[in-house]
Amino acid sequence: MKKVVKFGGSSLASAEQFKKVGAIISADESRVYVVPSAPGKRFPEDTKVTDMLLHVYETAKAGEDITEEMKAIKARYDEIITGLALKDFSLDKDFEEITKKLVENPQVDYAASRGEFLNGKIMAAYLLSLIHI
C-alpha cells in the first residue's frame, strides 16, 4: 500500500532536519507521496518562512521594496541547499519569478504557498540525490 507522509515546518527547518526526514522516507518504500511544509523555526527566536512570506506580501501590497526581505528568505533556502550538498540545484529562477509576481500583483494565497512549493522542490532534489549516491 502506498503511503502519504506529511512533514511539518520544524521537521524541515534546516539541512540536518531534511536529512532526518530523508532517512525516514527512505526507510519505507511505501512512503511515496511526500507533503512538505515550509521551513519552520530553527530556534525559539527564529521566524517561520511562511510568516516571512506573509510579511513580504504586506510590504509588496503597500508598494514598498521587498528586495531585502526576499534576500533573507532566499538565504534560509540557500543554507538548506548548501547543507544538503545539492551542488547543481538552485532556486534562483524561482525567487526571481516569485519576487516579480509579488511586486506586480501581490496575492496573499500565492505568497503563503511559496514556502511549501520551494521546500517541495528541495525535498525532491534531495531524495533524488540519495538514489544517485
Describe the role of every protein-language-model region.
Residues 1-131:
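Nucleotide/pyrophosphate-binding catalytic subdomain
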